[in-house]
């Protein structure tokens, strides 16, 4: 899981999971039914027209991901996501549909989701969800299959604008679209089992049975620096195509740097590009998507 910023609030360690976060920080008790579902088929039908050619270059997705069946991993992720929401709800930490911040996030999602099939055709079939969990932890994620969650800490502590929130959502969605979790789990399991990509592709079995048990790993999965850079750039373009100012990607990570004391701590640095390098990469790519943003704003 891309714990977007493996950050810790000042004087208070970030809990290892959202359930622990909810219990530790004692958020206001919320009631209300669990969040909404967006039918990806309908969303794709209303997708805004745009250039099919990506403006940022991230190369091809890893072939290793083929070792894990996408359908199996997505089903496992859906089960884990449902359990997580149920736990949050039992602790009064799941935002109801009427919560203003949740409505804001879903409005952003409604603009981003129709554009996602340009990066992964499977996204047309995903049943997207966006939910909000009460926790001081600075975090957000998107599981395989389009299951998104934000923690209130990332909204409240960073004082995010809509453009900045869209950059975070785009980044997390990009991890799912580029199937980073699928690739990382496949590499890990294949290595531990002594399997080669060639042997798998020649029909010597898949990791399907293992994938069915991978849901619990998704909440602690750490992506590589390459994965993080890909997610930054794909998320940048996705948000720009939806009409969100790409300059917000820079201001977002400047805020992240300040929130983490300028470094982010060992856990952050182990899986993310350093702050200055990340910002420079984004700054170099903003001009490539600026035209997409301006076109989207013109309607």
What is each stretch, according to the model?
Residues 2-299:
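A Zn2+-metalloprotease active-site environment signal
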